[in-house]
Amino acid sequence: IADWLFSTENDANGQPKGIGLSLWRFNVGAGSAEQGDDSQIASPWMRAECFLQADGNYNWNKQQGQRNFLRLAKERGVNKFLAFLNSPPVYFTQNGLATNTGRGGTLNLKEEHYKNFARFLANVIKGVEKHDGIKFNYLCPFNEPDGHWNWIGPKQEGTPATNREIARAIRLISKEFVNNQIDTQILVNESSDYRCMFDTHMTNWERGYQIQSFFNPDSTATYLGDAPNVPRLMVGHSY
């Protein structure tokens, strides 16, 4: 399977061995797998382990399957890696879950854990590089936070977030990376729909107009154009 995904070589008949993906995404899990059925995520396949444990220590034996694919990708020439999150660790969330069950459209992160969230991400970036030899070129702390899809049903790990919440967290993550001499670039988010970048699509203004919000200096509450490690990039999924 790794050859099919990553290889840029040809076989004896001159046919490509694979599709030669140039970047591989790694899902930094929030701990729903450890919660089991209590996670309220029905399918075990949709749950994810977390490096951070309840006692505050890190278990670098977690997420072995995904980490193995990072190594397989690197061995086959992939040189760009992106880490992303669907949810903060369950120890930091408002409802103690990695899903948005029973909540509204704001970030599922307790007020007192914003800095801990940033520290967790710095530790993951450093830990994976130390233990697996994989340097993440990019980190995306928020996956589809505009949340035009149904955040009520616990299908998988995930949380919405307003632009103000994203900006607040990104500034703290940026500061943590600078303090730890981490040069991984921080992507503002991965939008669930391109239209959320320049308008509102099945959501409200608090989670829309993302380009304007994050990269126009007039958007003083959410502007990230001067934050270290934050490139002027917007990422989205077209589906």
Name each model-derived stretch.
Residues I1-N137, Q156-A167, R171, K175:
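N-terminal catalytic cores of secreted or lumenal carbohydrate-active enzymes
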Residues D3, D11, D37-D38, D55, ...:
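Acidic-enriched, low-complexity/disordered segments with a strong bias for Aspartate over Glutamate
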Residues F81, L85-P88, I125-K155, V188-S192, ...:
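Active-site groove signature of glycoside hydrolases
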Residues G102-K110, E144-A161, S191-T200:
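Active-site-proximal beta-alpha loop/turn segments in soluble metabolic enzymes
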Residues K126, Q156-Y239:
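Noncatalytic carbohydrate-binding groove/subsite architecture in carbohydrate-active enzymes
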